[in-house]
Amino acid sequence: ALLSFDETTTLFHEFGHALHRIFADGPYDRTSGNVQRDFVELPSQVMEHWAAEAEVMKVYAKHYKTGEVIPAALIEKLEKSGKYGQGFATVEYLAASLLDMDYHVLKEVPANLDAMEFEANVMNKRGLLKQIPPRYRSTYFNHTMGGGYTAGYYSYIWAEVLDADAFEAFKETGDIFNQDK
């Protein structure tokens, strides 16, 4: 398949959700794999680390006609590009998380609520830069308005903390493929 690196990362991410669901052990199928929102993104986001690991990329990142493995120089550039703009991305997620929480502490939604004004007030109240808007705007923020993340969108940022620690445990073994350690 001809996937971009972003698409490959998404594939690994969604595969992490699938593995979590498949290997979750519970008495009832419909509830097995259900965990607190704080944890739900950990299995998927830890899988993203494997997508970006040079050792793993050499297994899947090959030319579709020749089978030539991705050059080490290109892997290095991909690693560097993953760090570029990290502060911007974190603020985007943080802004969306704060917006999500502020929507869910409203006692009632005013009939004349101006979503853009509400967003601006949330960002100003928290001292966030208006140049870096929330990752998702109110008008299409599906996670918080119906995607099951009500007041829990912060779990993506929290999962980054957890998944970095979890993946580091694999790296500390000296072999990220070792199933025994």
Locations of the language-model features?
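Cation-handling catalytic/transport regions enriched in His/Asp/Glu
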Residues: A1-K181
